[in-house]
């Protein structure tokens, strides 16, 4: 869709929009807000109030404007959100929406208030819904794809999907993982493991770590299916860090099936969890550029993951990939890696090497700046 850039006012003003987020989208927007502000742009971030509490947009050099963009459509909530976005877009040189809900409402707000303002959309997720919901989401995706000036896909499959839905311009826009936060205190692997394992577990018990929202996309039930096949003295302890709507069901399975697994809840000490882990597992139905995968490989922790979405291109040969939805294959891969010290050492060494091939936060910000320049003709 052709747009005439907004009249320049000296300083380029980028408005970043997101819906509720407790994962990679919020982290990425925080990184962009900080990087763009450092390059001299005026940056406004629009999203639910809790996202500022989680990610500290206000402390990134950006102005934060609360806009309650709900996870699901609602006539009243959407109308209110569109009204707030119209006001936030009043001086915008460009709007950059992250995710489908944010993109749809941003498009509506621009069409009724600032039709000449370019719209960039970063696509972070695949449509994994079924039935009527899938068809409705596809209609929304098609509208966004056709109306946005540019779609940036976090993985190659998302770029291909945007093009199939009618996007005139769709490009790869990798989402870089931020550096792992510094440890709050220097603790040894043994000290962290002792805290996590407790007094009832052997000190050398293998630890399998999984991190993410407890939602169907992450498919932690597949990990529990695999864990049900690990019995005996070398059975690993599965630690799952995260929170979400599937928490009750997962906890119920762990208890009823007597699985050697534990839910840790939301954690901010991923660096220490990685220090304690012998292996990281991603059991997802789909991922783009998984932050957990990036963190594991950077930290030199062996990774076993499902071969879905953007994961194969992200990890290359530095991780073990298994078919999605196959608990037997997942269980076998985990057991094989845990049983082979040499293989673990190979994967641990390959991870940081693979990570060197990824764009860092500075490169990601530079790409976005280039896109903004192209669409606005400024700077």
Task: Specify the residue positions occupied by each region the protein language model found.
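N-terminal strand-loop element at the rim of the active site
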Residues: 11, 15-79, 158-163, 244-245
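Short His-centered aromatic/hydrophobic patch
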Residues: 97-103, 123
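Aromatic "clamp/platform" in nucleotide-sugar-dependent glycosyltransferases that forms part
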Residues: 285
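A short, active-site helix/loop in glycosyltransferases that binds the activated sugar's phosphate group
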Residues: 148-172, 179
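Short hydrophobic beta-strand element within catalytic cores of glycosyltransferases
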Residues: 302-305
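Conserved acidic donor-binding segment of nucleotide-sugar-dependent glycosyltransferases
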Residues: 317-328, 336-342
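A conserved mid-protein helix/loop that constitutes part of the nucleotide-sugar donor-binding site
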Residues: 26-34, 206, 210-229, 245-251, ...
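Nucleotide-activated donor-binding/catalytic signature segment of Leloir-type glycosyltransferases, i.e.
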Residues: 251-267
